[in-house]
Amino acid sequence: MRARELRAQTLDQMKDELAKLKKEQFNLRFQKATGQLEKAARVRQVRRDIARVKTFLRQKIKESKV
């Protein structure tokens, strides 16, 4: 997910994206625990995407309060 794409999204879209990423992260952790994980790098990528979405979400909330 690119920063440019996140800036263009609304708060609701970001919240939906965050929920989707958290669900994917849960599934990846489950796959890792059961030994079925094929792409280990995806865990890191999803974790960073979650951080990125949270950062932009926080910025949007802060901007709307000002």
From Swiss-Prot:
Record GO terms (molecular function): structural constituent of ribosome
GO cellular component: cytosolic large ribosomal subunit
Pfam families in the cross-refs: Ribosomal_L29
Gene Ontology process terms (BP): translation
Listed Gene3D superfamilies: 6.10.140.1970
Coiled coil (residue ranges): none
The keyword Ribosomal protein appears for this protein: yes
Domain of life: Bacteria
Keywords for this protein: Ribonucleoprotein, Ribosomal protein
Family the entry assigns: Belongs to the universal ribosomal protein uL29 family.
Name the UniProt record assigns to this protein: Large ribosomal subunit protein uL29
Species of provenance: Bartonella quintana (strain Toulouse) (Rochalimaea quintana)
